[in-house]
Amino acid sequence: MSFAATHNLDGRTLTVDELWAISAPGEKVAVTPEGWARIKASYKAPIDAATDGRDIYGLTVNYGALKDQKVAGASVEAEPNRSASIKFNERQMRIQAAGLEPYFDDRISKMAMVIRLNQMAAGYTGMSEAAANAFQEYINNDVCPLIPSRGSEGANDLSMATHIGLALMGEWDVSYQGKRVPAAQVRKQLKLQPYHPFGMDGISILSNSNVAEAQSIAAVKKAEHYLALSPVDIASSLEALNGNVSPFLWHTVETKGWPQGHEAAEAVLANLKGSYLWKKDAKRYLQDPLSFRSAGYILAAAMEELNQTKGLLNTAINHTTDNPIVNTEAKNDRWYSNAEVLDEMRAGKPTVYVNSCSNFDNTQLALQMESLTKALGQVMHISAWRTTQLVDDHRTGLPTYLVAKENKGSDGFANIVLTAELTLFFTAPLFGPLTTLTAT
């Protein structure tokens, strides 16, 4: 039996593993008092900067090539500017929302909302308390906006995250209790107060990488599952081949010294406790094919890439991909801190900044995900090679496809071998250059 839990979001300590747990149905979140304080301070910064006469991207001026176009006056919170800001934000949600099915899984949708709420608690977004409450209500009631998985406009997934904003406004469909339901209907059923995106809410909802980060985390959890099974696969293959434990022993791996080498090798050996492979056998080959001998190091490479990817994502979900960014706890101890140009970026206090940036650039995450993908490709590739080796009667001394001679007309495990061979043939180009593991 499992029990739902409430997880605290402070904008500082959320991890990939905790986020994945939160994405399960029934799990709830609560912003810490420190998080709420940062949300309030972050919201105030761009409002104050606009009041001082600064043009704030997405708040007082339009987006992109239209950034010279005014959308609200300096006193943004006062009418008619407040209504103009809400109208602008709502219009942008409707303009940007486009995409094609299939829709993302509910867990990805929920993670995307949790990431955004946690980043609000970090104090980097400039979003309102009303926005934070709206996100929290959907998360805690498992109301998951339908997000098309195809049709992103490019940098920062503008079209994807916009569907979350539309659903918060009650203008799109959500997944609720296993069904596709109009958001307006669910909001009425749950008696939620109307939400109108004001100020920085609009640009901060639609222009961020939270959906991409949620996708990446879902992929990482799959990779984690596959790699957890890999030591069992390697160990069982060694047993089937009457293979050597030599490449996996501590004093062997120690001479290589690469990251995760010992962890991978020990994971394999743990599955060989009590195995006949620990006994002498005159029939055992001196060394095994590379797909067996190198399996530990290739698994180690994938484990290291997984760790690197999780580390980068742990950083990402506690920071932000917004433009502009708000930082209410900025340091002023740099050599350039007293430069005149920085005065134009400060919002009242010396430690409060609203800066134009390109935090939406995800080159590092994209490259890291590619590295993880290639590493998983290596693991899959040699697993397929091991399968082909295990039905080679010259290697094992067993009948072809494990079909007994008297069993006429049977194909035995032929389909498994064919699947492995097709895997080798069709998937190798997907992962880029693979190590030179031939059929040895």
Language model segments and positions:
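Generic secondary-structure signature for well-ordered alpha-helical cores
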Residues: 24, 28, 97, 137-144, ...
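Glycine-rich loop at the start of a catalytic domain that most often binds anionic cofactors/ligands
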Residues: 65-86
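Accessory "access/gating" subregions that flank catalytic or transport cores
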Residues: 238-381
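N- or domain-start disorder-to-order transition segments that initiate the globular core
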Residues: 1-53
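Active-site cavity-forming subdomains of large catalytic enzyme subunits
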Residues: 97-255
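Short, hydrophobic/aliphatic alpha-helical segments
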Residues: 35-55, 134-149, 192-195, 346-354
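C-terminal catalytic subdomain
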Residues: 361-440
